[in-house]
Amino acid sequence: MASTSNVTELIFTGLFQDPAVQSVCFVVFLPVYLATVVGNGLIVLTVSISKSLDSPMYFFLSCLSLVEISYSSTIAPKFIIDLLAKIKTISLEGCLTQIFFFHFFGVAEILLIVVMAYDCYVAICKPLHYMNIISRQLCHLLVAGSWLGGFCHSIIQILVIIQLPFCGPNVIDHYFCDLQPLFKLACTDTFMEGVIVLANSGLFSVFSFLILVSSYIVILVNLRNHSAEGRHKALSTCASHITVVILFFGPAIFLYMRPSSTFTEDKLVAVFYTVITPMLNPIIYTLRNAEVKIAIRRLWSKKENPGRE
């Protein structure tokens, strides 16, 4: 951190100012976060022990669920605890740590969604060569690449923010640490830093979104050569992917691809993609996937009847 900084602690304004509303939010968001951890954790457990789900598609799905848990846990626990606190504080080092892991897991999730789209493309457009192309080694490399991409992205974000001097005030108009609200507290011009963040976050999201849209267009065009049953199964899988893409990329593009003025709308949108969306993803994937639902039923059946094989 720059030597001119004398701010060591930051204060969040929070999502709402009314204590009664904050109490209601606590009652709502605590079960949502617990459902996120349990739902995504159940997918990870089911895929890891179910032989019927031993395919690249479900391997990627379990990795995505693991990232969802990590991504939501970066923000949600402190946010929920702060709903009951009169003064919501975080150290400057804790703020930077939160920014790092928030962007790390966020970009890792984006890249995993792109990987899953590629897997879907190969499965539908090149089914005869699927096992040769999507090998176990490639699966591990793609997942490792997603995590590495998230790490590199976060390092850039931290290098941008760590050079800024913070002389006061120390109140962040948000309920968690992110770059744009923190820029408002810097006692120097942050135009260039804002441009770097726009290029690193916003344009990255848009570029990834365009890749995803292009891949789904190619998939839909190729579905004309499939049977009615094959089209139905492929469309069901694609519908789940597309729904997750819209839920994740919509808010991200809204936040990072427009000038910042006030953060009232930003905070409401941020709640959606930091708390709500991670809970919805396992529901979206399991409700439209018969194999996952059957595997989960078998898992529970074994727990209830441990003597049965």
UniProtKB/Swiss-Prot annotation:
Please tell me whether the keyword Membrane is annotated for this protein: yes
Compartments (UniProt record): Cell membrane
User: Pfam families, from UniProt?
Assistant: 7tm_4
Spell out the PROSITE patterns in the cross-references.
Answer: G_PROTEIN_RECEP_F1_2
For the Cytoplasmic compartment, the record's topological domain ranges are: 48-55, 119-137, 218-233, 288-309
What this chain does, per the entry, is described as: Odorant receptor.
According to UniProt, the name of this protein is: Olfactory receptor 4B1
Name the gene that codes for it.
OR4B1
